[in-house]
């Protein structure tokens, strides 16, 4: 047991109370130099804290990120110690202080020497323990608030070198020295081929020297017979110690040349600057529509005035670095010293783990920073002028690397770190905290980057998506006559290969780091000691699993605006995936089905917990099975991870996925030979075209389906297996269609071991019951049983479409009868079940329900995406003192920072669904939209936008007379 020590806590001049201090416990017995140094630092901090803790201020409130996640990411020494209030007497001031930290998601800060000590209020796993308890971390001053803002905005740091990375500049003296060197080499060179190369390079230097000479002598140059005079540009003062300058500039846009004068009063300081091609593409990626993806810094060995002018030429509008921050963010290193991220971020504006470096030299950087350096080939416009004209310019590759690093970082932050942090309680220890993401985890080695300059085009994901993505991809696909084929992958290869999606990303220009590093990566939650490993073996496999793109120069798809990665739903991602892989919307050949066939054998997907969204990683297996197939060697049971917590958790940006079980029918259908599938599909199409078969589609997928939609899963591959839509979600959607509400009534089962029972009730009728070892398992089984019972009733009632079945089931209201296909607005819905082969009937209602249900959450996300609104689900945790509603979960929907809907439920899914329903009504009212669209409107067709429907369905809709389409 820990040795107890009491320490007094003050806030300003007021005493809050006493806390007992305990050292952190390290279960890892391996004591390398780094670990020993960390333990030494922790002991020093703890000894200083024992002298008394005086809180000077509070940190900023975390909008998305809990304080523990931020401090885990940026703290170099980890958890320093723990604090817990004494059992008695009660300390009211300390309790209020503790509750304030919990409620506002903030830390209490104590200035400790040259660092800050942050106290993080923690929940206790012991339900009877309502005493204040804290974890303590030590970080550099100011870095917490800076990194909090960056992590909330999904932003990283990027550090650029200047010379031979972004620019090449020469003065008259440097031109003369180099030309003299070429003259000596020409005199000594005997090989005619080498001689020709040297002469050509020297001529390029001479041409630029002549331009610079004209600029120095007459403030003008003659280019292609045209006289170009200088243009005066005003350089504002950077501080009170600087004076505004007026510089004479000449810009030769076609040659990427700028002539400038460092000191306008001294002509000898004139320089000719060659800008590296594709800088504009990289610069536009870093800031899209004013929203920064990276905070930009410069670290160079050049002189300061020269560096400031070079950066002004690169960023004339000051979009990358604000004018007020230039002096702090442009760091000049003296010759003989190494560059260091510690010196770049000396003012605590960023953490080295969150920074990417772009430089043409690796060895000039401190050894500990070298893993975060992406090395680019040196810019050599005189020696190799055609190098930058390659299919993939160097800076486009750098942009792709930055894109992949950012996507990978925040994918792991959202999918691995945040879910685990939400499970951490005061009783846990440092070993239970997962390793945080680090930029170095997502960079390939220098040797591997050589392949990036070719035409190899693996996928990369940048961790962002927006409505602009969908529009641009639709335009690109519709304008193109060629469609990219979907990758035909052996499922034996696809099953163990995991493709991470940082969001519902469009196919962006490539960087293999995303594909390679995560190809067979086990989940970080299951293995906290190796959460971000970078296996390199499946590189060759990964390169063949994706379709190739014609060019890498195009900008990453998600560049303009942004929907947070944590907020994208599976349907949005699925639409983007269909667009990415070039779904052929043209008329299919008569002998081919409209959609690509599934592989002959498809293993059921493992369900991996992920965030609901910033690129949430809740992919379905078809049509992009390879993206989320997880190796069978690393199964995850999300129930075990989230089971039986007595307290609600921190706000989470991922959806909790239940382990749904696929039926034997699904496995059988997946193993069906392609020819059998083709014959059956053709038969189903013919059945769908029967004269008396009139399909009906509600605003969302309803229980009343046309024969074409009930035929089988092949017609809707994107809805075949939903890894994110639980049975409770499906049942809730059915209840919405009925205008009713599903109620779950829990109880205990009399047995030797602890078991839970949950009954599902709809319209005062019991429709199902489930028993399990946990409430979640029991609820899941109850929902499945309810769907099965409803489906059985529906099938019995639908055996004869006549009116005699109108009251076959009790689940009816004035709008919908679950037992009658004719009840909805009295529209005919003829269905000839006998015309279909037995194998084509839907034998697993759970799968049918999963296919049909889209829900209010999906509708709300699509509405927000179409209107350019930013949506987020937030959870509100009850304080320990609230014993009455302790088991209830509260969810709220924030749109553009404004709460528009709230929900309460016994599960997170139930609370979130209720909040989404209320928010959907509010948003539609604010936007002036009708709450109920016309039943047959094309926009509500099948609950999906037309781009998600099979071409056969689209054409049948176009041929349908207006009386059949509109009410």
Curated annotation (Swiss-Prot):
Reaction(s) this enzyme catalyzes, per UniProt: O-phospho-L-seryl-[protein] + H2O = L-seryl-[protein] + phosphate; O-phospho-L-threonyl-[protein] + H2O = L-threonyl-[protein] + phosphate
Sequence ranges of Basic and acidic residues compositional bias: 665-684
Bias (Pro residues) occurs at 590-603
Q: What induces it?
A: Slightly repressed by ABA.
What is written in the cofactor note of this entry? Binds Mg(2+), Co(2+) or Mn(2+).
Q: InterPro entries annotated for this entry?
A: dsRBD_dom, Fcp1, FCP1_dom, HAD-like_sf, HAD_sf
Start and end of every FCP1 homology domain?
Answer: 151-401
Q: Which UniProt keywords apply?
A: Abscisic acid signaling pathway, Developmental protein, Hydrolase, Jasmonic acid signaling pathway, Metal-binding, Nonsense-mediated mRNA decay, Nucleus, Repeat, Repressor, RNA-binding, Transcription, Transcription regulation
Specify the protein name: RNA polymerase II C-terminal domain phosphatase-like 1
User: Where would I look for the motif Nuclear localization signal (NLS) in this sequence?
Assistant: 38-41, 947-951
Quote the subunit structure annotation: Interacts with FREE1, ANAC019, MYB3, MYB4 and MYB32. Binds to DMS3. Interacts with RCF3. Interacts with RS40 and RS41. Interacts with EIF4A3. Interacts with UPF3.
Which residues fall in a compositionally biased region of kind Polar residues?
A: 955-967
Q: Which gene encodes it?
A: CPL1
Q: Name one Pfam family in it.
A: NIF
Every DRBM domain range: 724-792, 855-925
**SUPFAM superfamilies registered for this protein in UniProt:** dsRNA-binding domain-like (SSF54768), HAD-like (SSF56784)
MF annotations from Gene Ontology: metal ion binding; phosphatase activity; phosphoprotein phosphatase activity; protein serine/threonine phosphatase activity; RNA binding; RNA polymerase II CTD heptapeptide repeat phosphatase activity
Q: How does activity depend on pH?
A: Optimum pH is 5.5-6.0.
Required cofactor(s):
Mg(2+); Co(2+); Mn(2+)
Any one GO CC term of this protein is: nucleus
Q: Note whether Cell cycle occurs among the keywords.
A: no
Organism (species):
Arabidopsis thaliana (Mouse-ear cress)
Q: What is the effect of changing residue 161 to A?
A: Loss of catalytic activity
Report residue spans for region: Required for nuclear localization (NLS): 945-967
């Amino acid at each position: 047991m820990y040795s107890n020590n009491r320490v007094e806590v003050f806030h300003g001049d007021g005493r809050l109370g006493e806390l007992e201090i305990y050292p952190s416990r390290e279960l890892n017995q391996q004591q390398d130099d780094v670990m020993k140094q960390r333990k030494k630092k922790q002991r020093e901090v703890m000894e200083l804290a024992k002298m008394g803790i005086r809180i000077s201020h509070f940190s900023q409130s975390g909008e998305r990120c809990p304080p523990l996640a931020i401090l885990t990411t940026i703290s170099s020494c980890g958890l320093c110690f723990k604090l817990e209030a004494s059992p008695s007497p009660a300390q009211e001031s300390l309790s209020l202080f503790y509750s304030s930290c919990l409620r506002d998601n903030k830390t209490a800060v104590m200035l400790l020497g040259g660092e800050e000590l942050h106290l993080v209020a923690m929940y206790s796993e012991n339900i009877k323990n309502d005493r204040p308890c804290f974890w303590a971390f030590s970080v550099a001053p100011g870095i917490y608030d800076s990194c909090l803002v960056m992590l909330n905005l999904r932003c990283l740091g990027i550090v650029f070198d200047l010379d031979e990375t972004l620019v090449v500049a020469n003065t008259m003296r440097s031109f003369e020295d180099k030309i003299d060197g070429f003259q000596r080499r020409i005199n000594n060179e005997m090989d005619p081929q080498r001689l020709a190369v040297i002469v050509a390079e020297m001529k390029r230097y001479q041409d630029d020297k002549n331009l610079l000479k004209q600029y120095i002598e007459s403030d003008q140059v003659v280019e292609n017979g045209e006289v170009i005079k200088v243009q005066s540009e005003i350089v504002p003062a950077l501080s009170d110690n600087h004076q505004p300058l007026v510089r004479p500039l000449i810009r030769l846009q076609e040659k990427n040349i700028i002539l400038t004068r460092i000191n306008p009063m001294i002509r000898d300081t004139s320089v000719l600057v060659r800008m590296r091609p594709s800088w504009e593409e990289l610069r536009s990626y870093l800031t899209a529509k004013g929203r920064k993806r990276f905070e930009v810094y410069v670290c160079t060995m050049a002189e300061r005035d020269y560096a400031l002018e070079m950066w002004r030429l690169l960023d004339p509008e000051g979009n990358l670095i604000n004018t007020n921050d230039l002096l702090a963010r442009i760091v000049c290193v003296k010759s003989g010293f190494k560059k260091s991220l510690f010196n770049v971020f000396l003012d605590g504006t960023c953490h080295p783990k969150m920074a990417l470096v772009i430089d043409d030299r690796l060895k000039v950087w401190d050894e500990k920073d070298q893993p975060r350096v992406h090395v680019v080939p040196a810019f050599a416009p005189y020696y190799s002028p055609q190098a930058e004209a390659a299919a993939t310019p160097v800076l486009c590759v750098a942009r792709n690397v930055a894109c992949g690093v950012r996507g990978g970082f925040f994918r792991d932050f959202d999918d691995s770190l945040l879910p685990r942090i939400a499970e951490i309680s005061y009783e846990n220890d440092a070993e239970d905290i997962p390793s945080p993401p680090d930029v170095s985890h997502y960079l390939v080695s220098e040797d591997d980057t050589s392949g990036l300059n070719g035409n190899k085009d693996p996928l990369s994901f940048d961790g962002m998506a927006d409505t602009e993505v969908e529009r641009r991809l639709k335009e690109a696909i519709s304008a193109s006559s060629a469609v990219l084929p979907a990758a035909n992958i052996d499922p034996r290869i696809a099953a163990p290969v995991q493709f991470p999606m940082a969001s519902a990303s469009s196919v962006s220009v490539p960087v293999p780091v995303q594909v390679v590093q995560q190809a067979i990566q086990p989940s970080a939650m299951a293995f906290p000691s190796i959460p971000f490993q970078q296996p390199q073996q499946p590189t060759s496999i990964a390169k063949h699993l994706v379709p190739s793109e014609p060019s890498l120069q195009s900008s990453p798809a998600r560049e303009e605006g942004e929907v947070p990665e944590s907020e994208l739903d599976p349907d949005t991602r699925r639409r983007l995936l269909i667009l990415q892989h070039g779904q052929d919307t043209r008329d299919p050949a008569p002998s081919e089905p409209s959609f690509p066939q599934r592989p002959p054998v498809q293993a059921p997907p493992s369900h991996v917990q992920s965030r609901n969204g910033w690129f949430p990683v809740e992919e379905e297996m078809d049509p992009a099975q390879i993206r989320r197939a997880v190796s069978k060697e690393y199964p995850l049971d999300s129930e075990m991870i989230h089971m039986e917590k007595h307290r609600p958790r921190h706000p989470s940006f991922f959806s909790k996925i239940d382990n749904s079980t696929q039926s034997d029918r699904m496995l059988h259908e997946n193993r069906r030979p392609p020819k059998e599938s083709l014959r059956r599909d053709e038969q189903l199409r013919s059945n769908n075209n029967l004269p008396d078969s009139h399909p009906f589609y509600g605003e969302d997928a309803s229980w009343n389906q046309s024969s074409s939609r009930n035929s089988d899963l092949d017609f809707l591959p994107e809805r075949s297996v939903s890894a994110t839509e639980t049975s409770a979600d499906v049942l809730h959607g059915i209840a919405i269609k009925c205008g009713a509400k599903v109620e779950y009534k829990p109880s205990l089962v009399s047995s030797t071991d602890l078991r839970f029972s949950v009954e599902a009730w709809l319209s005062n009728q019991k429709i199902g019951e489930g028993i399990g070892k946990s409430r979640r398992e029991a609820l899941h089984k109850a929902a499945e049983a309810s769907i099965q019972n409803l489906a059985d009733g529906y099938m019995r009632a639908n055996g004869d479409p006549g009116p005699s079945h109108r009251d076959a089931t009790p689940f009816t209201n004035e709008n919908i009868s679950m037992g009658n296909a004719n009840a909805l607005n009295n529209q005919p819905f003829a269905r000839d079940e006998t015309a279909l082969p037995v194998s084509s009937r839907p034998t697993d209602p759970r799968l049918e329900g999963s296919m049909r249900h889209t829900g209010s959450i999906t509708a709300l996300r699509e509405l927000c995406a179409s209107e350019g609104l930013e949506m987020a689900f937030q959870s509100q945790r009850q304080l320990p003192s609230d014993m009455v509603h302790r088991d209830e979960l509260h969810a709220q929907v924030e749109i553009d920072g404004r709460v528009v809907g709230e929900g309460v439920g016994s599960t997170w899914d139930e609370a979130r669904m209720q909040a989404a329903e209320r928010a959907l009504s509010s948003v539609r009212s604010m936007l002036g939209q009708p709450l109920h669209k016309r039943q047959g409107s094309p926009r509500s067709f099948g609950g999906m936008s037309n781009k998600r429907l099979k071409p056969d369905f689209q054409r049948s809709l176009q041929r349908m007379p207006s009386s059949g389409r509109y009410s």
